[in-house]
From Swiss-Prot:
Annotated source species: Candida albicans (strain SC5314 / ATCC MYA-2876)
UniProt entry tagged with the keyword Metal-binding: no
Gene Ontology annotations of biological process type: fungal-type cell wall organization; GPI anchor biosynthetic process; hyphal growth
Designated gene of the protein: GPI14
Intracellular or extracellular location(s): Endoplasmic reticulum membrane
Protein family membership: Belongs to the PIGM family.
Entry's EC annotation: 2.4.1.-
Taxonomic lineage from the root: Eukaryota, Fungi, Dikarya, Ascomycota, Saccharomycotina
This protein's record includes keyword Glycosyltransferase: yes
Matching PANTHER family: GPI MANNOSYLTRANSFERASE 1, PIG-M MANNOSYLTRANSFERASE
Transmembrane segments: 4-24, 79-99, 114-136, 156-176, 209-229, 271-291, 305-325, 341-361, 375-395
First-tier enzyme category under EC: transferase
Protein name per its UniProtKB record: GPI mannosyltransferase 1
Length: 398
């Protein structure tokens, strides 16, 4: 147990090291460490602190709750980085919950638990994202609390409340609801065992969906009362028709780029409005039906990996969404035991396909070379196909 304490202590110190280096870089280097999103969060929180709407800050496309959480940023000079510290704490708590859920697997040694939890706790990408001021860790801690109360405490009510809050915070965790409901269908006798479809319904999952949707509805209603339609438009509707072609790994990147250049009154095909169809069909329907009953967290990992791969906008922050489930998945998969070559191949292909895209993005952004058609388009397709191949191997490895 002392080794685990050392791991946690070191992970905290590592985050503070990144944080203080970030302060130095912001002060003395031309390329800033702090994420531009943090400046947006901070400005939005300033408006809330003044009793105004966070949506007065242009490009703030998030729930008002995030701006409310960051109100202390405005208490004075030394409070400016309060939000980063909040994200770092959420980051560590996420890691602790990952460790707690791994501890439920009696067959895992302490050493293996440490190694697997280190994938999150000592991951430089995870640490960089939270210490730069990205709010993803607030979302991950909500999702992991939902799983903690469901799988460790068997508390359906608290689990459903946390899931409802996470869906409010960002829409995508709603894809986890079918998996959880399907998982819970195996926990109790269904109401009508002989009726197809209805035979999945029992008291537990019925309670879960009611509490989840009620929590979501109540929080959304409160935010709507305060901020009106601008809350709905910016937090939800904007993301359905979003055209974001910059810093975007997605296979839809080039389509969105050319679409954004068209006149607003053009009659072009609105691919951004239907891109979610194959994405949701795979991540919210097919994968849960195959895996959720057998291994809930592994199902969530594959769902999220596919959801990100098929998303019309992909940035490095989105990788955090499936990394929270990776330690558990690796504890169950053959990719670390009898099929290590495939596991290494997946890792290398995922990294190389990203690096290829980043190379052409660097040439475009910093060297001013036109790499859209010859570089970024092909590297986006390469990244997408690499993710598809990895998904196939993930499924085969369980």
């Amino acid at each position: 147990m002392s080794q685990l304490k050392y791991l946690i202590t070191f992970s905290i110190l590592l985050r503070f090291g990144f944080f203080f280096f970030g302060l130095y870089q912001d002060e003395y280097m031309p390329v800033k460490y702090t994420d531009i999103d943090y400046l947006v969060f901070n400005d939005a929180s300033k408006f809330v602190y003044q009793g105004l709407s966070p949506y007065l800050r242009e490009t703030y496309r998030y729930t008002p709750i995030l701006a409310i959480l960051l109100i202390p940023d405005n208490f004075g000079k030394y409070w400016y980085h309060f939000g980063k510290l909040l994200f770092m704490v959420s980051d560590v708590i996420t890691g602790l919950i990952i460790l707690k859920l791994l501890s439920k697997q009696q067959q895992l040694s302490e050493k293996k638990k440490m190694i697997l939890s280190s994938i999150w706790l000592l991951n430089p990408m995870v640490i960089t994202i939270s210490t730069r001021g990205s709010a993803e860790s607030v979302l991950t801690v909500m999702i992991m609390l939902s799983l903690y109360y469901l799988l460790d405490k068997d508390n359906v009510i608290l689990s459903a409340i946390w899931l409802g809050l996470s869906i409010h915070f960002k829409i995508y965790p709603i894809i986890y609801l079918p998996s959880i409901l399907y998982y819970l269908s195996s926990q109790e006798t269904p109401f009508l065992a002989s009726v197809p479809g209805i035979n999945l319904v029992n008291a537990k999952n019925l309670k879960y969906i009611i509490i989840t949707l009620t929590t979501l509805a109540v929080v959304n209603y409160l935010m709507f009362l305060k901020y009106g339609w601008e809350f709905i438009d910016n937090s939800y509707l904007y993301h359905v028709t979003r055209l974001d072609h910059r810093h975007n790994f997605s296979v839809y990147n080039m389509v969105l780029y050319y679409k954004s250049a068209l006149l607003e009154d053009s009659n072009g095909f609105d691919i951004e409005k239907i891109a979610f169809v194959p994405q949701l069909l795979l991540s919210a329907v097919i994968i849960p039906l195959i895996f959720a009953k057998e291994d809930l967290i592994s199902s969530l990992f594959i769902q999220t990996f596919v959801f990100v791969a098929f998303n019309k906008v992909i940035t490095s922050q989105y990788f955090i969404w499936f990394l929270i489930f990776l330690p558990h998945f690796l504890s169950k998969t053959k990719l670390l035991t009898t099929d290590k070559i495939t596991g290494i191949s997946c890792l290398l292909l995922w990294i190389i396909s990203q690096a290829t895209w980043l190379y052409f993005a660097y040439k475009l952004e910093f060297l001013g070379e036109n790499t859209f058609d010859n570089g970024l388009m092909y590297s986006s397709v390469f990244f997408f196909l690499s993710n598809c191949w990895c998904t196939m191997k993930f499924i085969q490895s369980l």
